[in-house]
Curated annotation (Swiss-Prot):
PANTHER family: ATP SYNTHASE SUBUNIT A, CHLOROPLASTIC (PTHR42823:SF3). It comes from Actinobacillus pleuropneumoniae serotype 3 (strain JL03). The gene is atpB. NCBIfam families: ATP_synt_6_or_A, PRK05815.1-1. Belongs to the ATPase A chain family. Its main location: membrane. Keywords: ATP synthesis, Cell inner membrane, Cell membrane, CF(0), Hydrogen ion transport, Ion transport, Membrane, Transmembrane, Transmembrane helix, Transport. It is found in: Cell inner membrane. Key component of the proton channel; it plays a direct role in the translocation of protons across the membrane. InterPro entries: ATP_syn_F0_a_bact/chloroplast, ATP_synth_F0_asu, ATP_synth_F0_asu_AS, F0_ATP_A_sf. It is a multi-pass membrane protein. This is ATP synthase subunit a. GO terms for molecular function: proton-transporting ATP synthase activity, rotational mechanism. The lineage of its organism: Bacteria, Pseudomonadati, Pseudomonadota, Gammaproteobacteria, Pasteurellales. Pfam families: ATP-synt_A (PF00119). F-type ATPases have 2 components, CF(1) - the catalytic core - and CF(0) - the membrane proton channel. CF(1) has five subunits: alpha(3), beta(3), gamma(1), delta(1), epsilon(1). CF(0) has three main subunits: a(1), b(2) and c(9-12). The alpha and beta chains form an alternating ring which encloses part of the gamma chain. CF(1) is attached to CF(0) by a central stalk formed by the gamma and epsilon chains, while a peripheral stalk is formed by the delta and b chains.
Length: 262
C-alpha cells in the first residue's frame, strides 16, 4: 500500500514537461492557464455583446456586480487614473479565480482523461505551479517599476532607492540594500503565497483520494465526507487567494504611483 500510495502521489504531482531542469516548460500549466484566460474572455465578451439597458439576465447581473466591486476597490486604493488599473485588477481576479477553481475538479478525472490520449502526466491547477505564480508576480514587479518611473521620473526612482529611509549620502549603500530587498520581497511573497495555498489544497485533495484506495471500508467511507467538507472550504480558499493577489497588486501599484515620499 505504501509503495502504491507513494507512486500515486508522485504521479499526481508530476508535470507534463518539455525539457529538463530550469529550462523545462510545463505544458499542462501553459494549457490550463490559457484555457482559464479563454473562459474569462468568452464569458465577459459574450455579456458585453448581449448587454441590454432593460432587464438584465442573471449572468449580466453577476458580471456587472463583479465589475462594480473591483472598480470600487481600485477607486478606494489606487490614487491615480483607473483606466488601466481597473481592467488589470478585474483580469487578475477572474483569471486567478478560474485557475484556482480547476482544483475543485476530482483529482483523477483530468489525468485519466489525458491518459486516454497517451498523456501520462498532467497537473491541471496552474496556480499550484511556482513557475506560473512567479511569472505573474514578475509582471507585477515590472509594473511597479513602470508606475514608479511614470509618477516620479527616473531620477525620482533613483532617489527613492538611495535616499530612503535615511536621507543622507552616507547611507546610500544601506538605503539601496534595504529598498532593493523590500522591492524584491513584493513579487516573491506574492508568488509564494498563492502557490503555497494552492499547492497545499491540491495535496490535501490527493491525500483524501488516497483514502479511497485503502483496504479498510471505514477509511474509504470516511473519504467521502472529508472530500465534501474540504471542497466546500476550498471554495473560500480559491476566492480569497484570487482576492489577495488582486488586492496586493493594486496596493503595490498605488504605492509606486504615489508622488509623496514614503
Amino acid at each position: 500500500m505504501a509503495g502504491t500510495t507513494a507512486e500515486y502521489i508522485s504521479h499526481h504531482l508530476s508535470f507534463l514537461a518539455s525539457g529538463d531542469g530550469f529550462w523545462a516548460v510545463h505544458l499542462d500549466t501553459l494549457f490550463f492557464s490559457l484555457l482559464a484566460g479563454v473562459i474569462f474572455l468568452f464569458v465577459f465578451s459574450r455579456v458585453a455583446k448581449n448587454a441590454t439597458s432593460g432587464v438584465p439576465g442573471k449572468l449580466q447581473c453577476f458580471v456587472e456586480i463583479v465589475i462594480g466591486w473591483v472598480d470600487g476597490l481600485v477607486k478606494d486604493n489606487f490614487h491615480g487614473p483607473r483606466n488601466v488599473i481597473a481592467p488589470l485588477a478585474l483580469t487578475i481576479f477572474c483569471w486567478v479565480f478560474i485557475m484556482n477553481a480547476i482544483d475543485l475538479v476530482p483529482v483523477d478525472f483530468l489525468p485519466q482523461l489525458a491518459n486516454m490520449f497517451g498523456i501520462h502526466y498532467l497537473r491541471a491547477v496552474p496556480t499550484a505551479d511556482i513557475s506560473a505564480t512567479l511569472g505573474m508576480s514578475i509582471c507585477v514587479f515590472f509594473l511597479i517599476l513602470f508606475y514608479t518611473v511614470k509618477s516620479k521620473g527616473f531620477g525620482g526612482l533613483v532617489k527613492e532607492y538611495t535616499l530612503h529611509p535615511f536621507n543622507h549620502w552616507a547611507f546610500i549603500p544601506v538605503n539601496f540594500i534595504l529598498e532593493t530587498v523590500t522591492l524584491l520581497a513584493k513579487p516573491i511573497s506574492l508568488a509564494f503565497r498563492l502557490f503555497g495555498n494552492m499547492y497545499a489544497g491540491e495535496l490535501i485533495f490527493i491525500l483524501i483520494a488516497v483514502m479511497y484506495m485503502a483496504d479498510n471500508f471505514a477509511l474509504q467511507a470516511l473519504g467521502i465526507p472529508l472530500h465534501l467538507v474540504w471542497a466546500i472550504f476550498h471554495i473560500l480558499v480559491i476566492t480569497l487567494q484570487a482576492f489577495i493577489f488582486m488586492m496586493l497588486t493594486i496596493v503595490y501599484l498605488s504605492i509606486a504611483y504615489n508622488k509623496a515620499d514614503h
